[in-house]
Amino acid sequence: MKHLFLVALSIITIASYSQKPKIFELKSPDNKTTLIISAGEQIRWAAEQDGQPVISPSAISITLENEILGRNVKITSSGEEKIARSFKAINYIKETVKDECNQLTLEFTGEWGLIFRVYDNAVAYRFFTKRKDSLIIQKEESNFNFPADEKLFAPIQWDYRDGKNFNSSFEALYHEIRCSQFPKDSLAFLPLLADAGGDRKVLITEADLEDYPGMYLNLNSTGQGLQGVWAPYPLKSRIFHINYVPYERANYIARVSGTRVFPWRVAVISRSDKELLNCDIVQVLASDQRIGDDYSWVKPGQAAWDWWNNWNISGVDFKAGINTKTYQYYIDFAAENKIPYIVMDEGWSDDLDLTKRIPDSVLNLQAVLDYAKQKNVGVFLWATWYAVSRQMDEVFPLYAKMGVKGFKIDFFDRDDQVVVASTYAIAKKAAENKLMVDYHGIYKPTGLQRTWPNVVSYEGVKGLENFKWANEDQPRYTASIPFIRMLAGPMDYTPGAMRNATAQDYRPVNGNPMSKGTRCEQLAEYVIFFTPFQMLSDNPTTYRREKESLDFITRIPTTFDETVPLESKVGEWAALARRKGGSWWVGALGDLQPKDIVIDLSFLPAGEYNGEFFYDGVNADRKGTDYRRETVTVRSGEKLKVHLAPGGGFAGRISPTAASMLQNRIDDFVIIAVSDLEPITVNR
């Protein structure tokens, strides 16, 4: 098969161009994934795994004002390198990340080149230039051709606020369509997943996106392939409600430095769906951290959030709303339950001017911050991107001095070069003031959270807020995003609904919203949906009535030392286990079809463990809040039989028993024995 694939690539290239191309073949460390590059009058790349084509020959190039990088190329040098390294991850799903691949660097006349990498589970390439003067990037060509008309999970957007479909909140259900059925008038944002047949999947995304527009995809001329599309550079913009929307764009996509690297174009190739739940490729390809040696002030954790529950607390002697007493109530709730943060969402200030706060007689922000400090609770403030991008030099020092710990910055709603560059500038300025940031209304993560670890989360997901106004198949979506969107990085889905309804009973309600699905599905989201900054979205009054669920939620960490994917299927159910210290957390959630799954505890080291498990109740198909809590003793290798109700879930905590912990200590104990006159160290 491989021989035929190489021949096909050569035939396509030679038939199209008179110049005989140079063919390069680069293999993964395990020799099972191959990247094939053809460089001549055009540059094409293709990929295969286990001898099966996964990406057919696909052309790539960058068009400048007077030349095309990728046409009629002349190679000046080529070199291969084996990369085998690891790094300590900051606030991630595991403690250490491995970067193991083979790399090919090609340099061409004209002071530019390409870097290709092959991992066991991914292929990637990026352009680079070494020129003195700045460059105008008129367009880029990036194709992903498939060997067949494959089924896609495509997050397609239709948003014409700017007249050109380049404004987006980056929230969309997945259109499960064949590639040839891709709507011609639309774009898909990343990540996008293709089913390559059997159990194999191909996920397309990008990494290390800096000072350059983000990539969208649409159908290319082959009819069974996708091509990159980029937002043109914005020249003029205007306020549209609280967005800043371009109304005039240039005929180019970016103006960049002449010496730079461009974003990685990435295709993740998995042999099973569960592999997608534990893929580090975006983290690996991102630029290393720039925050400095001391980032101890970047402290992940959970937050009590106001906006989703509409400030609807009850049983108090004051009027609930955006006022001092309400936020002191949220702070009390957070302190009682060891929740480290609260988020003060929209309403504390003018949306477009963060120096204009509502009167102290209504909301005394300094009093709230002082009260929070006394209770050892941090405060995040909501703000629009428009306001922050214009006022950060003034307001970041101001609010940091008052005691604010971070900002939730919303309504970017674009990923053109201007906005992408601003995400780095905001993160840097925030770090200078020891502020964390949570980006909302924004494109997918591409590694900025590694470069600037004070970026503690991203939205870029159709989260729980949609239950306030939409009746959609959210459970199938939540059973899909762990494999697709979450592969890109942290995901601020904002779980935690305590009003849980079946599909038959569900209805959108703004003031007292509910989730479609079961209580256990909400609990499972805290284990499965990774974000260092995790919301508790329902209101404190409701949580206090649901103390058993609350106590479980607030014990779940937001960063982990190890992640183990369990048997899963995209769009049907997702299951995984995560370890923090000596304790394991396990979760599973499903679509609207009831199903029986098995949770294999073979990931546990040998020993005896205490298990606390939450199962869908026997009547969860009739009443979404029905659940069963069970405490049992389990051992490694046991298999838990789990029934998922429609929109159901399962969640649990597994920790070593006292006897097991004692045995581990004995096993690790070092005995000093004496033999004649020489000490002997015996490890047991």
Give the residues covered by each predicted segment:
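Bacterial Sec-dependent N-terminal signal peptides
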Residues: 1-22
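N-terminal accessory beta-strand-rich subdomains and adjacent acidic, glycine-rich linkers
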Residues: 21-284, 290
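An acidic-aromatic substrate-binding cleft motif
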Residues: 253, 257-333, 337
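Conserved, mostly hydrophobic/aromatic
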Residues: 334, 410, 437, 528, ...
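Aromatic- and carboxylate-enriched substrate-binding clefts and catalytic-loop regions
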Residues: 345-518
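Glycan-recognition and catalytic regions of carbohydrate-active enzymes
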Residues: 538-585, 621-625, 667-669, 673-677
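Carbohydrate-binding surface patches
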Residues: 570-606, 610, 650-651
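C-terminal beta-strand-rich structural cap/linker in extracellular carbohydrate-active enzymes
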Residues: 633-680
